[in-house]
């Protein structure tokens, strides 16, 4: 009788310990996942701000800089000068990227009142917003220049 009780208590203890370990592991994974997601969001915002700040200070946009920034920050950029897409991007962008860029532009205009297709909407200060789409982090910006406006969409 004691042997049977001993076996039952052993299995019961193992079950309780297993449940406690499972709950603790799940909680730790949840916390780690949220931290990783928040870290990725903060990194994206910092990288996007760096790119926007660089474009604010430059009068000439180098294709080498664009390619290097996209590679270093693991982002895709759509930069338009007074509504005209840069020639470099016309050669590289595939239809999927173009669809995502246009969707980001629509969300920016509809939900955040930052219309990239209306370059006259910005005065003397750069306007930028950050938001999330289903699979992407997005930043859109309108940057005033002496010759007009540079609009920018960054996807991560």
Language model regions located:
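Juxtamembrane segments flanking the first transmembrane helix
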Residues: 1-95
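Compositionally biased, low-structure terminal segments
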Residues: 3, 45, 102, 131-132, ...
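Residue-level marker of intrinsically disordered, low-complexity segments enriched
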Residues: 14, 18-19, 29, 77, ...
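Generic detection of intrinsically disordered/low-complexity segments and helix-coil linkers/edges
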Residues: 35-38, 124-125, 130-131, 150
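Extracytoplasmic ligand-binding sensor domains of the Cache superfamily
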Residues: 64-132
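Short, hydrophobic beta-strand elements of compact beta-sandwich sensory domains
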Residues: 132-156
């Amino acid at each position: 009788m004691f042997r049977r009780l001993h076996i039952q208590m052993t299995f019961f203890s193992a079950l309780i310990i297993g449940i406690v370990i499972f709950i603790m592991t799940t909680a730790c994974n949840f916390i780690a996942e949220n931290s990783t997601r928040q870290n990725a969001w903060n990194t994206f915002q910092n990288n996007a701000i760096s790119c926007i700040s660089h474009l604010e200070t430059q009068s000439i946009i180098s294709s080498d800089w664009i390619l290097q920034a996209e590679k270093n920050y693991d982002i895709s950029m759509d930069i338009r000068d007074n509504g005209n897409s840069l020639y470099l991007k016309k050669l590289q962008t595939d239809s999927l990227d173009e669809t995502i860029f246009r969707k980001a532009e629509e969300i920016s205009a509809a939900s955040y009142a930052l219309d990239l297709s209306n370059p006259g909407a910005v005065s003397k200060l750069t306007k930028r917003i950050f938001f999330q789409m289903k699979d992407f982090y997005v930043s859109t910006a309108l940057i005033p220049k002496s010759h007009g406006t540079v609009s920018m969409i960054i996807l991560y």
